[in-house]
Amino acid sequence: GVGDYELNPDKIPLPVRKAIVAGINREQIQKIRFEKIGWNEKAPGSMCFLPLQEGYKDSYPTEIGEDVAKKILEDAGYKKDGDFYAKDGKKASYELFTFGDDQDVKTTSQFFSDQMKKIGIELKIVNRANSELTKVSTERSYGIKSAGYGITTNPVDSAYYFYRSEINNGHGKELDSLADKMMATEDYKKQLEIATELEKRHLAEVAIYIPVSNGPNYQACKKGLANYGPRLFATSAYDPDVWINAGWEK
């Protein structure tokens, strides 16, 4: 799957969204989250592909860092007012919604907030119960929310879901024709190429979804269990080998 931060385009102007994409230190967030379990990975470049899948390309912008983020804001007319940037009397201040009581989520969110402060963007952390995620998402009451999605065997379908304006409350209409072209293309490899182009442009031009981590997949099993465990895309419904050879060590 993929863990991400989602920026609400109804509440956060495009230049600020672009600055957040450029300024977030995803590698440090990963380190905070996974260091205790000894997991290391390269920051993901996609919401739709795992790095091991056919067609994967790193779609994340290459010009990143605090200085890049500040320049994006200043080029858009934002000026520092104390610790934070502002424009037309409105401070770059937004609510970062987290869900549940996971300590790692709290720690990484605080780091994210602290890092944005260095850039000049204020993030106020709002914690809600896991049960409120759907309500908050439907009402679009968040500025930024932490979320996560499963990655499927078909990145094309995922790209069509994430990167159409219909799902993003009308934002990114200029890319709808590219999404439609992708779905109308018969050759699957060409579809994958268009999907990566669509994702790259959406990250650069619309800036809503920030892929942060893929993470590990652990399963707890009784000692002695053989031929069973994390299995990526394989499911017993479609692949009998998932369960037919499961058993106990002799």
Q: Predicted regions span which residues?
A:
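Extracellular/periplasmic solute-recognition and catalytic clefts
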Residues: 1-10, 144, 148
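Short, well-ordered beta-strand elements within core beta-sheets of diverse protein domains
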Residues: 5, 124, 180-184
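Detector for C-terminal structural segments
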Residues: 21-61, 68, 104-113, 135-250
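Ligand/substrate-recognition segments at binding pockets and active sites
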Residues: 79-151, 188
